[in-house]
Amino acid sequence: MGKIIGIDLGTTNSCVAVLDGDSVRVIENAEGDRTTPSIIGYTAEGETLVGQPAKRQSVTNPENTLYAIKRLIGRRFEDKETQRDIDIMPFGIVKADNGDAWVQVKGEKIAPPQVSAEVLKKMKKTAEDFLGETVTEAVITVPAYFNDSQRQATKDAGRIAGLEVKRIINEPTAAALAYGMDKQEGDKVVAVYDLGGGTFDISIIEIDEMDGEHTFEVLATNGDTHLGGEDFDNRLINYLVAEFKKDQGMDLTSDPLAMQRLKEAAEKAKCELSSAQQTDVNLPYITADGSGPKHMNIKVTRAKLESLVEDMVKATLEPLKQALKDADLSVSKIDDVILVGGQSRMPLVQKTVTDFFGKEPRKDVNPDEAVASGAAIQAGVLSGDVTDVLLLDVTPLSLGIETMGGVMTKVIDKNTTIPTKQSQTFSTADDNQAAVTVHVCQGERKQASANKSLGQFNLEGIEPAQRGTPQIEVTFDIDADGILHVTAKDKNTGKEQKITIKASSGLSDEEVEQMVRDAEANADADAKFEELVTARNQADGMIHATRKQVEEAGEELPSEDKEKIEAALTELEEAVKGDDKEVIEAKTQALMEASAKLMEIAQAKEQAQSAPEGAQEADAAPADDVVDAEFEEVKDDK
């Protein structure tokens, strides 16, 4: 059996590792480096370059050199963040037929997974050269806050690269594996702060060690899938462009070659300022005008850089607080803090993390290699080479379906350990309803439309019956990769329909982290919306039951009472169309009072039919414990 390799597919750099005996070996690439730039260059001669060779030719070929493609995976073209990237990136970002964001190189549209596959091929070849054998299987890491479509797209990239992706695992979890494997110190709770090239994640992980066996359980995760070193670079680039314009009166943003040189210089300056107090950005012949060539020579201090990015560093604190809250832990309960990702080397980042947790982060974890090392350990678990490790990861956002009134009914809560399979039973909202639409959503808001639609499908062929009678079992199944499968089954007929969330219908990066922020900021609005929907659903149930009782009462109902009831019904139906909960509740009460005679008739009939052979439950308004949906929830007693 061949080796399963571990790959950290990063925004800025990628890394590959393998289990070599009892230890992890990070593998050097053909250039002798332990990390490879996630850069792909397409030359005029038709050659595809990956890593340092692509980076070296990027200045002269900016339009056909792709980087930070990980930020486009699973994203829609219309997304605000995509539009912002269009202004920043020197290469073309275009709209695919399915609405996704793709890139354009030499007139050809390419999907992000295809581009990422080139980096994975390089990682695969690097491992094969070291091992001396063909590699066909891999464990690939993704940001903890990646959604279903992004995870699926990452698996697609692996397949394009000729790899069977045995497992997708979260980057902070992988880093914790690398950190915790050699620790024989009993139980610990660690915080993994992962600030990489394009994404930020925080995970709170409990490591239990007993007799050499380790259990890694993720207690909570949070993050921002559009915050990383690339954004820090862009802040510095914008500052340098503004300073040059102030000094020389020329705008460099319209010159792709100049901007590519500036990007490299800004990245280099940022790294230098992690150890030095100031550096020079010196770019001779950066551009030219009628008077001759222009040169850039700008001093940048560490203090200046910190002032440019301070708000982004502070922005990482809210996810930290939320993760601790979700894990039900105080800062004092964190035993160790692990920093992962190249951007975490910045002194301001380290100081911010130290101040927040009240302790220095660990220095014995390599920020660039820990994630790939953890992936290699997980690969060893899957191949059977490592037997004393159990990894329990979580899903970052809640998953559910849209139910009647536009409510999102959660089936799986955020931070649920995966893999997991959970079911709820729903029913129809109308008499003789032959089909239901299962609309799958992801997010934390009560209002389904405020969350993100992942997909929908129809379950047809339901046998005609009164509303609330059919039982539709909806099952959410999240596999170990965090990818969602949804099934709806009619318990009576056995008919079933399934959906697997595909990359074309996934969430955008900005939308994912915005959902949780919105849920917190709009808690009051959500509560009011939920109350309004409850009032509407109770009113709908009352209207349905009353009309049925009027029909059954027939001539026994005096015309005067019938007119009162019809008037009250009309007023309540109008009220339900509005957004005033108090009015809906008042009109519901008015209908109940107008229906007093109707209730007397119904009770008299019930008593008359109380013989055993005719005993049946009268059709009543929906009980309080039933959720009216596009369906109506039937809660099983288990």
From Swiss-Prot:
Residues 604-626 are annotated as: Disordered. The modification Phosphothreonine is found at residue 199. Induction: By stress conditions e.g. heat shock. Residues 613-624 have a biased composition (Low complexity). One of its GO terms (molecular function) is ATP binding. Keywords: ATP-binding, Chaperone, Nucleotide-binding, Phosphoprotein, Stress response. InterPro entries: ATPase_NBD, Chaperone_DnaK, Heat_shock_70_CS, HSP70_C_sf, HSP70_peptide-bd_sf, Hsp_70_fam. SUPFAM superfamilies: Actin-like ATPase domain, Heat shock protein 70kD (HSP70), C-terminal subdomain, Heat shock protein 70kD (HSP70), peptide-binding domain. Belongs to the heat shock protein 70 family. Acts as a chaperone. This is Chaperone protein DnaK 2. The gene is dnaK2.
